[in-house]
Amino acid sequence: MIKEFMTQDHRDCDAQYAPLEEAISKEEWDRALELYVPFKKAMLDHFAMEEDVLFPKMEEFVGGGEGPIYVMKMEHSQIRSIIDSLGQAIEAKDRQKALGYGETFMIMTQQHNMKEEQILYTMAEQLPFDKEATLQEMQKVKS
C-alpha cells in the first residue's frame, strides 16, 4: 500500500524531470523555468510526505538515531541543494551547469529511490501503524 504509492510517486517525479532536461538541452530557458517550478514542487512534496508523515510514524517503532531514516533525511538535504543549484543554473541560462546538476540529481535520486523502495518502504509495510490513515495523510501533502 505505502510502498506502491511512494514508488509510483518516485516515477511521477522522474517523469517530470525528463521534459525539463530536454528544455535545458535545447536552451529553451522560458520553458525550462516553467517546467522547473512544478518539478521542484513535486520533489519537495515527496520529501514532505516522508519527513512529515511517514518517517515519524516509522520512528515510533524503530527510533531515530543514525539508521536508514536518518540517512534518507540527509540525502534529501543533499538533493534539495542540487535542485536549488539546478534552478539557479536555469535562471542564469547556463546549459553546462544545468545539465551537470541534472545529471548529479538523476544519479543521486536513482540510488536514493532504490534504497527507499527496497529497504525503507518494505520496512514501513511491516511496522504496526495504520497504513490507510498514513496514506491519507501523505495524500493531503500532495494536494
For each feature predicted by the language model, list its residue ranges.
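Small-residue-biased structural context
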Residues: 1-143
